[in-house]
Amino acid sequence: MLRDVLTLSRHVLQQFGSFTAEAQDFSALMNRIALAGKMIARRLSQAGLIEGALGVTGSLNVQGEEQQQMDDYANRAFIRALEQTGLVCRLVSEEMKTPARLPENCSLSRLALMIDPLDGSSNIDANLSVGSIFSVLHPLEDRPEADNQDLLQPGRRQLAAGYILYGPSTQLVYSVGKGVHGFTLDPSLGEFILSRSDIRIPERGSVYSLNEGYFCQWSEGIQNYVRYVHRRDGYISRYSGALVADFHRILLQGGVYLYPGTQKKPEGKLRLMYEANPLAFLAEQAGGAATTGTEAILDIVPQSLHQRVPLIIGSRENVEEVLRCLEGSLVP
């Protein structure tokens, strides 16, 4: 039996409870983000068949990381989807040192979109899941635009956040601060249709997700957490190497995802503004928690657009378990 068809654009309007200009602009913005997701999903589905979809570009991105062909395509897809729309003035991306300014939009909108256009892109050559992450901000009016100071604001000020997961199906999950909702792309309609409403992360889950290859580089507290779960029944390790895919599992099934700092990189690897903040926003909206190990992710005042942070995110009880290991009150 077919379920009720509620499209993404209609759902956004329902979230605002009105047809105000703000609601319509947000609905249009989510549609353009969804359009970029459809473009990326189509390209990924053809990745083994067309030239220039697999492998690396031969250059490094602003993070000093080897850029995959699909990283570059995904970044351009978001820019193309938002040009000439009047919806977003600035686009901050993992793939660009400075924000892309869309001058034709700035007379109509001051909103900024923060994106990781393609998370986990090293998975593509092996045909594994990847994702896109996004966050919508309103620049602070009392801060100068120079050096993008007006964008450096805590994650609690996000207007909306979400991600698109490219897997067996293409799914979009988002929140405007009124719960977390999931949509599945119906290829026959070309529309994202509501498939999960008011998602709540379980208070506790069995999954822990982290790359244990870095064990020797972690702090004693993180090492003790790994020893703790190894020595007890009821814990399952799942790690794909794609943040969106691993977080999506935690969101639906419960558990905890960890990407802690290491001896070489105590600041962590994940970017605050367009990776940790959006997912932390979703986690808290769904009843979960997100922390660096010392402070809530959403309370951090960013110092730069590409700032990195450690991340511990997931079910409240699981996150608390990690924190107790860090403080030494829970021992293996």
From Swiss-Prot:
Pfam families assigned to the protein according to its UniProt record, in alphabetical order: FBPase, FBPase_C
UniProt-listed CDD domains: FBPase
SUPFAM superfamilies: Carbohydrate phosphatase
Binding site for Mg(2+) 1: E94, D116, L118
PANTHER family: FRUCTOSE-1,6-BISPHOSPHATASE-RELATED, SEDOHEPTULOSE-1,7-BISPHOSPHATASE, CHLOROPLASTIC
Binding of Mg(2+) 2, residues: D116, D119, E275
HAMAP family found in the cross-reference section: FBPase_class1
Protein name: Fructose-1,6-bisphosphatase class 1
Superkingdom per UniProt: Bacteria
Cofactors named for this entry: Mg(2+)
GO CC annotation: cytosol
GO biological process assignments: fructose 1,6-bisphosphate metabolic process; fructose 6-phosphate metabolic process; fructose metabolic process; gluconeogenesis; reductive pentose-phosphate cycle; sucrose biosynthetic process
Recorded GO MF terms: fructose 1,6-bisphosphate 1-phosphatase activity; magnesium ion binding
Phylogenetic classification of the source organism: Bacteria, Bacillati, Cyanobacteriota, Cyanophyceae, Synechococcales
Gene3D superfamilies the record matches: 3.40.190.80, Fructose-1,6-Bisphosphatase, subunit A, domain 1
Residues that hold substrate according to the record: D119, G120, S121, S122, N211, Y239, Y257, L258, Y259, K269
